[in-house]
C-alpha cells in the first residue's frame, strides 16, 4: 500500500502479494470486493469522489486495476493470500514509486505508479490474457460531478453524449478538478450515465432498495486475449477548471521505458528519476546509466547534473539491497 499526499489531492494504491492477505469477505459483507487489492487506486481532491458509490459500482472496473470484464464475487471468507511475489515500492518520504507484477484471474500485467508533486504517472506493460473477454484497465470510476471536457488535439469540447469510444485516445479528459492525459494513445472508453444497484448486493445486512447514481466511468480497453499490451496515463489532480489545461504542460515528464524489463519515468523539473527493474538489467538514457544486478525499484535525485540521493528496495522482500553493490550508477 502506498499513500501519496499533497496539499491539493491525495492518491493511493493498494496491492497484494504472497506475503499479505487480500480484502476480506465475512459476515455477508464486501461480497464483490475481490479485486480491491489488485492495484486499486483512489484519487481524491474534494474527498467525496467515491462517497456511498459502492452499490452502483461496476466491480470489475475498480480504479487502477487491469481485469477481465465481469464482476467476480469474493470466493473465500476472511481473506486469502495474494498470488504475486513482486509487489512493493520505494520512497524518500516525499516522492515514491509503487509496482505490482500481477498474475491472477487469467491475466498477467506489470503495473507501476510514479508519484510526483503535481502528477502521478501510471504505466502498464506485458499485459496478456487467456480469458476470452475484454481486458480493461480502469482509469477512474467515481461520481459524475459537473461537466466533462475532452481535448482531442484538434478541438476542446464539452462531453454531451452518454458514451464515447476513442480508438486513439484524446490528449486529455477533464472532470471534477482532475485531468487525465494519455501519452500513449490507447483505446479509450468513457461512460457518463446513471448506474443502478443496491446495498444488499455487496452486504447482506442492508436493504435491496434500488439506487441510481450518475457515474464517471473511464477505461482503457485492451481487447480480448491481448498479448504484450501496454498502457500509459497521467493523472493531474487539482486542476479546478479545464481552461487551466491550456497553460499546463507535462513536457517535464518523460516516460523513458515501459516494457517487460524496465518501467521508468524521468521528472526533469524536480530532478527525480524513478526506475522499476523487473529483472537484472541496465537503464541508459544518455544522461545517466544505472545497472541493477537484481530486480528492484530505484529512485534517484539529481541536482546540477550530479546524483545527490538514491533509494532502492526489493519488491520481493527477500533481501536488503545496497547502493554501489546491487545497484550501480555507471
Indicate residue ranges for each PLM-predicted region.
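Beta-strand-rich binding/interaction modules
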Residues: 24, 320-330
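Extended polysaccharide-engagement surfaces of secreted carbohydrate-active enzymes
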Residues: 1-296, 302-308, 316-319
Amino acid at each position: 500500500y502506498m499513500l501519496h499526499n499533497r496539499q491539493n489531492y491525495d492518491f493511493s494504491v493498494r496491492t497484494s502479494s504472497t506475503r499479505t492477505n487480500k480484502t476480506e469477505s465475512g459476515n455477508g459483507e464486501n461480497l464483490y470486493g475481490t479485486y480491491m487489492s489488485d492495484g486499486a487506486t483512489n484519487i481524491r481532491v474534494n474527498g467525496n469522489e467515491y462517497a456511498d458509490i459502492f452499490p452502483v459500482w461496476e466491480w470489475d472496473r475498480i480504479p487502477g486495476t487491469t481485469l477481465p470484464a465481469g464482476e467476480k464475487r469474493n470466493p473465500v471468507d476472511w481473506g486469502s493470500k495474494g498470488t504475486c511475489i513482486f509487489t512493493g515500492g520505494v520512497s524518500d518520504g516525499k516522492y515514491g514509486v509503487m509496482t505490482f507484477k500481477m498474475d491472477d484471474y487469467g491475466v498477467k500485467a506489470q503495473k507501476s505508479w510514479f508519484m510526483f508533486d503535481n502528477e502521478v504517472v501510471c504505466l502498464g506493460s506485458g499485459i496478456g490474457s487467456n480469458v476470452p473477454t475484454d481486458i480493461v484497465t480502469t482509469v477512474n470510476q467515481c461520481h459524475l460531478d459537473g461537466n466533462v471536457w475532452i481535448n482531442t488535439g484538434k478541438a476542446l469540447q464539452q462531453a454531451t453524449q452518454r458514451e464515447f469510444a476513442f480508438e486513439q485516445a484524446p490528449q486529455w479528459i477533464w472532470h471534477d478538478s482532475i485531468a487525465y492525459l494519455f501519452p500513449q494513445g490507447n483505446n479509450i472508453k468513457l461512460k457518463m450515465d446513471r448506474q443502478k444497484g443496491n446495498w444488499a448486493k455487496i452486504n447482506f445486512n442492508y436493504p435491496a432498495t434500488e439506487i441510481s447514481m450518475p457515474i464517471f466511468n473511464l477505461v482503457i480497453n485492451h481487447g480480448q486475449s491481448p498479448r504484450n499490451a501496454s498502457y500509459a496515463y497521467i493523472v493531474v489532480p487539482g486542476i479546478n477548471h479545464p481552461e487551466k489545461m491550456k497553460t499546463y504542460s507535462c513536457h517535464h515528464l518523460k516516460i523513458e521505458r515501459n516494457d517487460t524489463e524496465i518501467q521508468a519515468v524521468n521528472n526533469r523539473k524536480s530532478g527525480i528519476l524513478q526506475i522499476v527493474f523487473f529483472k537484472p538489467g541496465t537503464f541508459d538514457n544518455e544522461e545517466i546509466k544505472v545497472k541493477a544486478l537484481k530486480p528492484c525499484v530505484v529512485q534517484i535525485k539529481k541536482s546540477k547534473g550530479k546524483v545527490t540521493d538514491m533509494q532502492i528496495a526489493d519488491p520481493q522482500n527477500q533481501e536488503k539491497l545496497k547502493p554501489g553493490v546491487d545497484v550501480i550508477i555507471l
